[in-house]
Amino acid sequence: MKVSDRRKFEKANFDEFESALNNKNDLVHCPSITLFESIPTEVRSFYEDEKSGLIKVVKFRTGAMDRKRSFEKIVVSVMVGKNVQKFLTFVEDEPDFQGGPIPSKYLIPKKINLMVYTLFQVHTLKFNRKDYDTLSLFYLNRGYYNELSFRVLERCHEIASARPNDSSTMRTFTDFVSGAPIVRSLQKSTIRKYGYNLAPHMFLLLHVDELSIFSAYQASLPGEKKVDTERLKRDLCPRKPTEIKYFSQICNDMMNKKDRLGDVLHVCCPS
């Protein structure tokens, strides 16, 4: 970053320097649109390190497999210490849940097939171009769906903790055998982490009707929507049989509106 740009950065009283300094990832989220409008940006490639889970910038010595799994971001480069470089990428600070996510010009939908592999773990299934366009909405608006999933999960936890024996929550939040409440006391940061992990699955449930897989794998049964499990097994190999069974059951439940998202929404939005 040029000295003049750094002065603009500091004069605007941004706190992203401190955030970048304390963040172990090379890629750091920044909600300031002003920063990206006032300081020159660049496109850099990043990848998720499989051992540490950290987001690293692609360098000359980065291995071929990591390069293959890389994705591109529009970033502002900053030096936060001696030979310590971080990259700020734009994210929305507070998503508008009434109007839905709005893609930013500072986000680029690159390598969507990689996103499907790393986030949804369904890389052996067959998706068409329209499916990739739909799935790219999660890639473009990951911050929105992360926050949405966190808020839904937080609301579920609050209600389940307050009334674990209520009939509307017993099936979801009690032990199947004993009927005892299984809701643990969790810190907000823990719920947020769980919510972020839930985000890809929440996205799939919200957009399930837009994906061709649920027509491509539909069995020909009159009067009933059902997934062709045998075809799923072939396309999901070499996954474990238990995983195949679980995934096919999820497909069937979602197609017939029996998925647990209904339970979640019922708990979060009681009448």
From Swiss-Prot:
Organism name: Saccharomyces cerevisiae (strain ATCC 204508 / S288c)
Name the UniProt record assigns to this protein: Uncharacterized protein YHL049C
A Pfam family the protein falls into: Sir1
